[in-house]
């Protein structure tokens, strides 16, 4: 190939085409076999896998422009080779992983199977065989991320996983590269579109939780079994991955405290608005005094906060660093084409690295083994709704118990009594979780208490 001038994709008088590849113009000779072809295997042909295959066919010229090579998906690993998959030729389908692993022509493995096994085994074996890997598998990375990244580094192989956390939102590379000098101290993310859609409908249209979940299911945002979404497990895997990268320390899914949105009520939404807040399910990780906090739970955040404006199924990640201050990344966090587009971005990076012989994961000199702080030792403000007997002194007695256990009240509203029961809505100052729990246990034993209707953490220290 030679240097040339012209517009990308423009045919010259000699029958060649010129492409802009970075800052270099590349001339493609129209002779069979002249292109550098990178052969890949796609593991999984489901929603995202089929999207990746379709994009790889649509973007052939664009990929060559950006990398100087062409991509050929030589094999697609599926469970059932007899099943018709529109757009994917049957002759490239296989149910035999060993056939892919032992094929020396295949340089790149694109893992889109989901689940921990056999995906983890396939990723490990691919890296051990010297193959580059792109994956969107948050389950594997949240459980075995450090093991896999260390293996990639030691074997001199690429592993890219931008799509594993927030779909089309670019956050993995910024955490590893652009923000590497920012001294990050906190990440907060709306990283589950299903729960954000549900909470948006509850807030804006007055739906209760069951109505909003039914609507999310109808639109395809929620699975038939929504447990992983609504209980915070999906967000927990994503915040574990981001925490590991941000603080260069091992954080796994089992380290994450998780609390979902199933107990959020219309009353919680309404009272939050009265105080100037909206409720979001957030993944949060902080580095405080050499210890990592990592958790997922609903939170009241001020209406003026950037995350408060993230609606429906959109995702967003908000980061704070001592050097960079605040930054937010927002976009589609899931879906066939948004996720496939993030996978394609990773594929293009790996292809470019193969062409320039620059493969390999660089995780840094060493991991910092920061301990993960137990949830009982973290601090938060709290929103607390109590149903109490409508008797003189009830509020004073409860305030006294809270105060005696280091729980200071920042705001309190007493709602009109009904049938001899009054509702107290309290927002506390920042308090240790264990002190708050100790106080709550005592309050639950008080004769004036009828019910604890809601407990939600509040943004701010």
Residue ranges and their predicted role:
Residues 27, 32-129:
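N-terminal glycine-/serine-/threonine-rich beta1-alpha1-beta2 phosphate-ribose binding loop
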Residues 211-309, 314-316:
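Substrate-binding/catalytic subdomain of NAD(P)-dependent oxidoreductase enzymes
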Residues 347-461:
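A conserved regulatory-domain signal marking ACT and ACT-like small-molecule sensing domains
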Residues 132-134, 409:
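A short hydrophobic/small-residue beta-strand
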Residues 184-188, 196-199, 203, 215, ...:
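Catalytic, metal-anchored helix/loop core of enzyme active sites in primary metabolism
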Residues 120-125, 138-165, 172-175:
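Rossmann-fold NAD(P)-binding glycine/threonine-rich loop
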Residues 171-184, 195-207, 237-251, 346:
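Oxidoreductase and adenylate-handling cofactor-binding alpha/beta cores
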Residues 6-8, 15, 20-24:
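Short hydrophobic alpha-helical segments enriched in small aliphatic residues
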């Amino acid at each position: 190939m030679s240097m040339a001038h012209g517009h990308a994709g423009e045919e010259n008088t000699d029958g060649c085409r010129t492409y802009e590849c970075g800052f270099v113009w590349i001339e493609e000779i129209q002779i069979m076999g002249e292109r550098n072809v990178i052969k890949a295997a796609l593991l999984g042909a489901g929603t995202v896998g089929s999207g990746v295959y379709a994009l790889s066919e649509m973007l052939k010229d664009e990929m060559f422009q950006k990398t100087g090579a062409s991509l050929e998906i030589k094999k697609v690993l599926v469970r059932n080779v007899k099943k018709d998959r529109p757009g994917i030729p049957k002759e490239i389908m296989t149910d035999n992983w060993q056939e892919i692993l032992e094929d020396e022509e295949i340089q790149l493995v694109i893992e889109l199977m989901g689940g921990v096994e056999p995906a983890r085994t396939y990723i490990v074996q691919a890296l051990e065989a010297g193959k580059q890997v792109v994956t969107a598998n948050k389950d594997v990375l949240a459980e075995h991320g450090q093991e896999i990244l260390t293996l990639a580094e030691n074997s001199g192989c690429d592993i890219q996983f931008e799509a594993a956390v927030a779909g089309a939102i670019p956050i993995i590379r910024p955490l590893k590269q652009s923000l590497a000098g920012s001294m990050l101290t906190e990440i907060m993310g709306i990283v589950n579109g299903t729960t954000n859609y549900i909470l948006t409908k509850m807030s804006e249209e007055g739906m209760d939780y069951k109505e909003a979940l039914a609507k999310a299911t109808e639109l395809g945002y929620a699975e038939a079994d929504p447990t992983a979404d609504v209980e915070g497990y999906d967000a927990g895997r994503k915040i574990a991955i981001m925490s590991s990268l941000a603080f260069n320390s091992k954080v796994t899914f089992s380290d994450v405290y998780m609390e979902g949105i199933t107990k959020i009520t219309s009353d919680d939404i309404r009272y939050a608005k009265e105080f100037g807040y909206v409720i979001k399910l957030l993944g949060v990780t902080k580095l405080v005094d050499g210890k990592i906090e990592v958790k997922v739970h609903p939170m009241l955040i001020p209406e003026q906060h950037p995350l408060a404006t993230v609606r429906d199924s959109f995702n967003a990640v908000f980061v704070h660093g001592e050097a960079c201050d605040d930054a937010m990344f927002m976009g589609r966090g899931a879906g066939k084409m948004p996720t496939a587009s993030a996978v394609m971005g990773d594929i293009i990076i790996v292809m470019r690295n193969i062409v320039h012989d620059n493969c390999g994961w660089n995780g840094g000199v060493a991991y910092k083994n920061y301990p993960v702080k137990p949830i009982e030792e973290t601090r938060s403000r709290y929103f607390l709704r109590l149903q109490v007997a409508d008797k003189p002194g009830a509020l004073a007695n409860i305030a006294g118990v809270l105060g005696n256990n280091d729980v200071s009240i920042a705001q309190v509203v007493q709602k009109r009594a009904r049938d001899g029961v009054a509702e107290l809505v309290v927002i506390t100052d920042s308090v240790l979780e264990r002190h708050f729990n100790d106080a709550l246990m005592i309050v639950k034993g008080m004769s004036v208490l009828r019910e604890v209707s809601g407990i939600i953490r509040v943004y701010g220290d």
